Swiss-Prot record:
This is tRNA dimethylallyltransferase. Belongs to the IPP transferase family. The record marks T104, R128 as: Interaction with substrate tRNA. The gene is miaA. GO terms for molecular function: ATP binding; tRNA dimethylallyltransferase activity. Its cofactor is Mg(2+). Disulfide bonds: none annotated. Catalyzes the transfer of a dimethylallyl group onto the adenine at position 37 in tRNAs that read codons beginning with uridine, leading to the formation of N6-(dimethylallyl)adenosine (i(6)A). InterPro entries: Dimethylallyltransferase (IPR039657), IPT (IPR018022), P-loop_NTPase (IPR027417). Residues 38-41, 162-166 are annotated as: Interaction with substrate tRNA. Pfam families: IPPT. HAMAP family: IPP_trans. Keywords: ATP-binding, Magnesium, Nucleotide-binding, Transferase, tRNA processing. It catalyses: adenosine(37) in tRNA + dimethylallyl diphosphate = N(6)-dimethylallyladenosine(37) in tRNA + diphosphate.
């Protein structure tokens, strides 16, 4: 890829791997702007539950695309890409280094590699699948998706109503799977990207994830969920589908007791981290670092900015 393209640094990896701390270090060292690339951290009502950077962290350098979306609003790779492109171009115009930080690999891939031009889905198809999901539950529809598109189904949570129904709608309307559409996307490079992956094993992550959930609960995750219900009390809303959001909602309405909520939250977080690791390990363009090797990461970024690999 031409060195004349503007440089973008991508910090990706599983949830809880330490991406935020590394991003802050790089932002200070290279005058960076941190741009969210996590599909859950866009929601305004859930800063604690989705582990958004704290106010103190965000005060250290410019942050973009955190907590700007209402709970009932939908986000897609294409819409996020438009927002991210604007944020990247803003940073570049200010002479700052764009740092894309997050665990939603599909978003980063769509931005950097191009996105499939999937036709608009007719409203009747969309409504039918939404009604079916409400009646049968997302897990049953996810099982259907496994038969249709096992590759994509393996990358999303069985309770992710938005992505499960979207994939089924696309298949019904176009006759092609989501995976087929993604593979057909034409590359449209606008940036020269260094893709940094955070190497972590699931066994090493699990105790960190459990501790992080306990910290979230101690910091007021349940109060946060209570306030979110005032704004939107529809558990099928996109914002509530996130891990941690769905479990706290279930606890607040009496479907899960406290310990069950915590157990399910950790189980789902661990399963999500496993899917993220599978996704990112399949991308041979990533350069891998230990999560705490901030100096090594900084040296790699400096080399890249000088025109290295």
């Amino acid at each position: 890829m031409s060195n004349e393209l503007p440089a973008v640094i991508c910090l990706v990896g599983p949830t809880g791997a330490g991406k935020t701390a590394a991003a802050l270090h790089l932002a200070e060292r290279f005058a960076g702007t941190v741009i969210n690339a996590d599909s859950r951290q866009v929601y305004r009502d859930f800063p604690i539950i989705t582990a958004q950077p704290t106010a103190e962290e965000q005060a250290q350098c410019p942050h973009r695309l955190y907590g700007f979306l209402e709970t009932e609003a939908r986000m897609s790779a294409g819409v996020w890409g438009d927002h991210a492109t604007a944020a990247i171009d803003e940073a570049l115009a200010q002479g700052r280094l764009p740092l894309l930080v997050g665990g939603t690999g599909m978003y980063v891939r769509a931005l950097l590699d191009g996105i499939a031009a999937i036709p608009a889905i007719p409203r009747d198809i969309h409504v039918r699948w939404q009604e079916r999901c409400a009646a049968e539950g997302p897990q049953r529809l996810h099982a259907m998706l496994c038969d249709i598109d096992a590759e994509y189904a393996a990358r999303i949570h069985p309770n992710d109503r938005q992505r499960v129904t979207r994939a089924l709608e696309v298949h019904e309307h176009t006759g092609r799977t989501f995976s087929e559409w993604h593979r057909s996307a034409m590359p449209a490079p606008r940036y020269r990207a260094l893709r940094i992956g955070f190497a972590a094993t699931l066994d090493a992550l699990t105790p960190r994830l459990a501790h992080r959930i306990d910290l979230m609960l101690a910091a007021g995750a349940l109060d946060e969920a209570r306030r979110a219900r005032v704004h939107c009390d529809d558990p099928s809303a996109p914002g509530w589908s996130g891990i941690g959001c769905a479990e706290t909602y279930a606890h607040l309405v009496g479907s899960l007791d406290y310990e069950a909520m915590r157990h399910v939250w950790l189980h789902n977080t661990r399963a999500y981290a496993k899917r993220q690791l599978t996704w990112f390990r399949a991308d041979t363009r990533l350069t891998w670092y230990a999560p705490d090797d901030v100096e090594g990461i900084a040296l790699g970024v400096a080399s890249f900015l000088r025109g290295g690999a």
